[in-house]
Amino acid sequence: MVRDPVNTVVAVDNDGTTTHVRTVKPMSRLNSTNSQNTVTFVDSKSNDKGNDRQTQPKKVPTGRLCQEGDTVDLDTPMSSHERRHLLFLATSRDRWRSHKVHNYCPACILRRPEYGLPCGHMYCEYDIRRLGRKIGRETYAVEECTCCQARFTDVVFKFRPKTKGIRVLALDGGGVRGIIMLQCLHMLQSMLWVFLPGMPIIDLFDVCAGTSSGEVEAGGVKKSGICALSLAHKGMSVKKAIQDFTDLSQRVFVSQPIWARAFNLIARGSIYGSSAIDEALKRHYGESKLSDYTPATARAAKILVTVKGTPKGDHILSNFNGVGLDNSHKDFEQTFCHPDDEEGQKAILAWEAARSTSAAPVIFPTFTIDGVGTFQDGAMWRNNPTDVALSLVPALTQGHCLPDILLSIGTGFEKRLQRGHREPQPPTRVTIPLIDLLRRLYAFMGDNIVTDGEKFHNHIMAGRSDVGSRFRRLNVPLSEGYPSLDDASSIPRLMDEAAAHFKSHPGLQEVLDSIISSFFYFEVSSRPIRHRTHVSFCGRILCDIQPGHRLKKFIKDLRIRGAEFSINGKFTALDSVGEWNGREVYFEIPVRGTVAGLHTQLEIFLCWNMLGRQSKEMISRSPFSLNEIMESQGWDSPQSRALRQPVRSG
């Protein structure tokens, strides 16, 4: 028999008092069925510190404090105008079967579409929620396309809860050094599987940004930009990505004598031709478009890769169709489909995006997407795409400017001598001027802040002190220096150096701690009540893991490690939840208390013991105010527009 998950309410008062209050009737959740029952609430002002007797709680009706009827979705039934429009779409299904649009959502004609269905039609998040069948918390199954009436099975979208922050993954470029990044993700995933067996590490991140090799690793060109496409868009496992990376690197980067490399460079402007890499990427990605229904769009993840226009222009190629970008972003352009595509038939293919961002000068020729432009390696603009991904956070989290965690992974760096310990430089040898020029240009490209991911990381940290502990950087010092971008023989050495470095480095454990704590988030259950001296609220701490064996094991392992929540400095253990069946019931802990005002910051931490080491990390989006949480939930928005986001027109 399944027991209710919660039989204790945590009451937190702004005078520093925390009390675990036994309810008259255990509540599986706060809903309209139990909201009229009387629960006990301890008034902190009635505590007598000089009396050891237990203070008698006073009873207050919970009809206004704890009704979930106000909280769940804030959705309203469709209006007559909306129903009439959907009926018109259904009657025009023959035309819509061959007509697809990418610049507006056909169901509402108000917003840009973000989520593609297997038939090729795209809808915005609001209408996916409206047209889909809700099968779980923030989870919707779409069984039919409104436009063409095509029917589907297993087309499910899981959206991020409104009050939950986002996790960002940024992957540097670096040719074959991209194997370092994959090895890092593999080791981090192994640590994660202790708590969440079988969960792909890439599924933890809401925004994935890559450049150069971070995206093609599985396509045969080993650069760091293609990982974002292979791991997230294609849903490839890290283990398979490592194997494909190694095999295809050796296939594409065929060893050539010096004279052959020089001849190819002079004859066609690159050491390698387009055919080898193009065919490898086509086989890997097929005809998949950035707009297709993929493992990434199924969990509402945003993927982007950076590319450099030729002769100029900075661009990102993404799967989110410009949603989240506004006119303030003047330093780069977003490209999703062919700008002259009126019929919606020319969305950019995944392999084209991978090929564009991997076109490293000298190594591969530039790549032209018909009707869009000619592009080269994104590392020429952003070898470390951290700031590009970070610029999207406010729009994706309704104004909250900081992610829960921003994980930036490098592809190795050379150890530099500390200031004051420089070795004397030998005098410059007399060389042929052209050769000397090429040598200096090569050295400049490798030591430039744009192409040196580690330098750019330090630059961001110096200018974004607000990011602080949320920004994690993982990289490996290379004892033998940088291998060339196409040196496939260096892959085993790079993997060994990465494994040895991260085995003893605390950085991976710190990243894991932040990820684990960010599974938990807070939302208000009813509208807070303003009193003369304070504001009382009713909320709950939730976990963004679906009920099942995975959730049950996750909570069990945290309990074993003595996990507890710190709410404004006061603690409540996970054991206070009592007996709970995580295979069938969502995790939640109701929290009631008082704060000085709606704008008062509320801090919630998850604390636990890991191998004798105490860990304390903020839950998702903490610290926050009640006003921020209410705004994210849409309390003060017109109900029919609560989920609608303003987007850039055009």
State the predicted function of each range.
Residues V2-P5, N14, R29-S35, F41-D43, ...:
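Conserved catalytic cores and adjacent C-terminal regulatory segments
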Residues V9-A11, T18-V21:
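Short linear proline/tyrosine/threonine-rich motifs used for host-factor recruitment
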Residues H20-P26, I604:
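Long C-terminal appendages of very large multidomain proteins
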